[in-house]
Amino acid sequence: MIAMNMDELGTQHEEIALIAAQLRQAIADPDQPQAVSALRWQLARKLMAHLALEDRILYPALQRQGDDRVRTTAARIQAEIGALAESFARYMAAWTDERITRDWRGFCADSGRILDALARRIDREERILYPLARSVDDGATGQIARAG
C-alpha cells in the first residue's frame, strides 16, 4: 500500500488557485491582449498532474471504501465535476498562441469558463471530498491508502 497525503493535495489546490487567479487577472480586459502563454502552461503542468492523482487514485480509493456514504458521495462528485481534465486538455489544444492573438475576446471567454469550472471543482473538493477522505484515513497522518 502507498499513502496519498491529503495535505499535499490541499497545497496543490492553493498553488493551482494562485496561478488561475493570475490568469484570470490577465484576461480581465478583453480589449487588452496580454502575454498568457507562460501562465497557461504553468497552470497546465500543475493542474494535469494534480487531476491525475485525484481522478486515478483518490476518487477510486474512496469508491472502494466500505462506507456507502463515502462511496456514493465520491462517485457523485466525480460524475458532476470529473471531466475537467478532458475539458482542460481540449482548451489547451484549441488555444494556440497564434489563435489567442487572433481571437483574444474568444480566448478570454473560453478561459473564463474553464477557470470557473476549475474553481467549482476545487470548492467542491475542499468543502466535501477532502473532509470525507480525511474521515476515512488513518487519522494521524492525513493520508489515505491506495493500491500501488
Sequence positions of predicted segments:
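Small-residue-biased structural context
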Residues: 1-148
